[in-house]
Amino acid sequence: MVVVAAAPSAATAAPKVLLLSGQPASGGRALPLMVPGPRAAGSEASGTPQARKRQRLTHLSPEEKALRRKLKNRVAAQTARDRKKARMSELEQQVVDLEEENHKLQLENQLLREKTHGLVVENQELRTRLGMDTLDPDEVPEVEAKGSGVRLVAGSAESAALRLCAPLQQVQAQLSPPQNIFPWTLTLLPLQILSLISFWAFWTSWTLSCFSNVLPQSLLVWRNSQRSTQKDLVPYQPPFLCQWGPHQPSWKPLMNSFVLTMYTPSL
């Protein structure tokens, strides 16, 4: 016997279940048969999918329903485990990528810190060469880390003006090199003067000490030599002159005078 359940209204075009109770199937079960309604057939013909309601399991025994429920629960649990495993592997990969990126950023941050320190030292050296006052540590840009972010503290307006005027200062330094050397000369000139004064004082003290030791000895030697020469000197005796007169053997004044002048007494 065939029982046909018609749709209660035209708006609901859901299929109905027909039970064939004339010939029982093997195992004493009734076979369900799904028959589409008029609108469902039209929708299938048009190609648009139609939402199906949940199938009633009135033809299954309680044991079969429990077995089916167990199978569905197993499938759902396995699906959930697979999804969880895939999600965990994805999160682990993201953690590894983030750790690598964090390590790279830390290295880059360290390099930037070293570069900033080198630039600050170079800036101070340039300011010292130009004769300008060095920047205070508070005016130097600093990198402050707060939490996971990094914030750059800008310097004062003086540092910005210095960066803008750097080319002009380089040109001035090239055009006037003595101005750059002037501070160094001011620092080196007193040192040179002090070194010269100390050398002159040392030289004078050394020469005085040398002459104080040598001069008395030379004076003694000179005095002794003078005394010895005075003792060895022979007193000068004027030549003996004969009186002219008739007692002379001959009267030859010129010849006798020449002989007397050439005569020297023997010692």
UniProtKB/Swiss-Prot annotation:
Region (Leucine-zipper): 91-126
Keyword Lipid metabolism: yes
Transmembrane segment boundaries: 181-198
Region Nuclear localization signal (NLS), annotated ranges: 69-85
Region (Disordered) residue spans: 35-56
Major location category of this protein: endoplasmic reticulum
Site, Cleavage: residue positions: T185, L186
InterPro entries: bZIP, bZIP_sf, ER_Stress-Reg_TF
Post-translational modification: X-box-binding protein 1, cytoplasmic form and luminal form are produced by intramembrane proteolytic cleavage of ER membrane-anchored isoform 1 triggered by HM13/SPP in a DERL1-RNF139-dependent and VCP/p97-independent manner. X-box-binding protein 1, luminal form is ubiquitinated leading to proteasomal degradation.
Assigned keywords, A-Z: Acetylation, Activator, Angiogenesis, Apoptosis, Autophagy, Cleavage on pair of basic residues, Cytoplasm, Developmental protein, Differentiation, DNA-binding, Endoplasmic reticulum, Lipid biosynthesis, Lipid metabolism, Membrane, Myogenesis, Nucleus, Phosphoprotein, Protein transport, Signal-anchor, Stress response, Transcription, Transcription regulation, Transmembrane, Transmembrane helix, Transport, Ubl conjugation, Unfolded protein response
One Gene Ontology CC term in the entry: endoplasmic reticulum membrane
Record text about domains: Isoform 1 transmembrane signal-anchor domain is necessary for its own mRNA to be recruited to the endoplasmic reticulum (ER) which will undergo unconventional ERN1-dependent splicing in response to ER stress. Isoform 1 N-terminus and C-terminus regions are necessary for DNA-binding and weak transcriptional activity, respectively. Isoform 2 N-terminus and C-terminus regions are necessary for DNA-binding and strong transcriptional activity upon ER stress, respectively. Isoform 2 C-terminus region contains a nuclear exclusion signal (NES) at positions 182 through 204.
Family the UniProt entry places it in: Belongs to the bZIP family.
Protein name in the entry: X-box-binding protein 1
Protein source organism: Mus musculus
